[in-house]
Amino acid sequence: DVAVDLRSNSETYGKWYGVILSAENKKQFLIPEGFAHGFLVLSNEAEFCYKVNDFYHPNDEGGMAWNDPEIGIEWPQLKGEYKGNASAESYTLEDGTALNLSDKDQKWLGLKDTFKF
């Protein structure tokens, strides 16, 4: 799991923090308002549960490129090269498994083009 600070007045704007969550380590990850959230599933199966601070509003949904070099998230077990967009086609996991991203997630722009809080 990864969180990226989108608060434009923050000293940590554009910085990321990540943690591996698993059934074994039983960790949870609290992501405050003003941060983007992303995750990479490293197993064949996963159960993903989350809680938010308000009701879902489709018009409030946003996103950013998961592989933006300006942020430089170090995704675990990932091999590949940035090709100028959020497409997963040039990336695999270390075991050769292809990434599976939704069409929506492959179209997000980088940090500089993302909304700020």
Predicted feature locations:
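Non-catalytic, conserved peripheral segments adjacent to functional cores
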Residues: 1-27, 40-45, 52-117
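Active-site micro-motifs of SAM-dependent methyltransferase domains
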Residues: 37
